[in-house]
Amino acid sequence: MEKLTILLLVAAVLMSTQALIQGGLDERQKAKSNFFSKRKSNAESWWEGECRTWNAPCSFTSQCCFGKCAHHRCIAW
């Protein structure tokens, strides 16, 4: 009976340890995927309508896909 109790305790400790480790890995994987998915390419931003192409009217640099607004037009350089 003692051996069975010890065996059950060891099994419970191992299972809880595995659950803790698995939970930590899931959080790290989510953080890593969020880090890589935050920034979009110029083409993706343009395709989704989040920025303006070359020679389009603009007021701010952030409106242009290429990141430059001069004389109220998006420019590439």
From Swiss-Prot:
UniProt keyword list: Disulfide bond, Knottin, Secreted, Signal, Toxin
Signal peptide feature range: 1-19
Keyword Endoplasmic reticulum: no
GO molecular function: ion channel inhibitor activity; toxin activity
Compartments it resides in: Secreted
Pfam families per UniProt: Conotoxin (PF02950)
UniProt keyword annotation of NAD present: no
Protein family per UniProt: Belongs to the conotoxin O2 superfamily.
Protein name: Conotoxin S6.11
Source organism: Conus striatus
